[in-house]
C-alpha cells in the first residue's frame, strides 16, 4: 500500500520553553517520546538504567540514555541524560531535585518505565510462575510508576501540565485477561493510575492520560524477528499480524500532540491508543501510514471480522 508523506505531530517550536521528563527513555517508545518532544522544541530529561558504563537486566548494551539524550538534541530540543533506577526512591528524589534546581517546574512527565519483557510467562498459571519473577514484573510495571509519579508530580502541579502513563494494550483489550496474572496486573495498573491521577491533578489544571502504542516495532521486537526498520515486512511470513506494526515515533507523536494541545483536559483520565490520537490530531507514522493496531486486534483477531491488516493502516 502506498501512503502519503510523513506528517509530524507539532511544529518545531510548539513546545519551546517546556520542560519534559521521560522515565524509561533508553529505547523503544521511551526513546521516541523523548526525541519527538525534543523535535517540538522541549528540554527533555531522559532517564533509564542502561548507560555507557552499565547494562540493566534487560541485557541490551546497544541503547543507552546518553545516546537518547544526544538524539533529542539532534532533533532540535535539549536532551539531558540522568541515569536513574526508578525503583530507588532516593535516586528519583535526586532527579526531582535536579529538575527543580534547573527549571523550578516540570511541564510534561511521561511514565514509561518497564523493562520486563524477559520475564513475561505467557500462558503460565500463577503457581507455575516463579514468584520472584512475577513480583519483579509488578515492581517494574507498577511500583516504579508509583514512585515516579509520587516524587515528580509535585513539580508538575506548579503549572498546568501533562502526565502520561504508558501501558501495553487498549482499555478494551486490557479488560480481557492478558494470559498471566502478574503481567495482567502490571499492564492494567497504568490505566487505573491515569484514572485516579486525573482526579488528583484536575484541581491544579493538569491532565493525566494513559497511552498505548500498537504492535510496536521496537529495537527488541525487530531483533526478535531478525529484521530491521528497513525490511520489517520480511517478518510477516512468521507473524502476519505484524502487518499492522508501527514505529515507536507514531505513539510518540501522539504524546507530543497531547502536550502541545491547549485543550488536552478533554482527555483527562482516559486511556487512548496511538491510532486514536492519530485520528484526532492528523499526524502519521514515519512512512505516512496511520496504523490502528488495537482496533485491528479487537475487530479482526478477537472479533472475527473478515478484513486484512492493510485496511487498518
State where each predicted segment sits.
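C-terminal helical subdomain
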Residues: 210, 230-313
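Active-site-adjacent segment of SDR/Rossmann-fold oxidoreductases
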Residues: 33, 196-206, 262-265
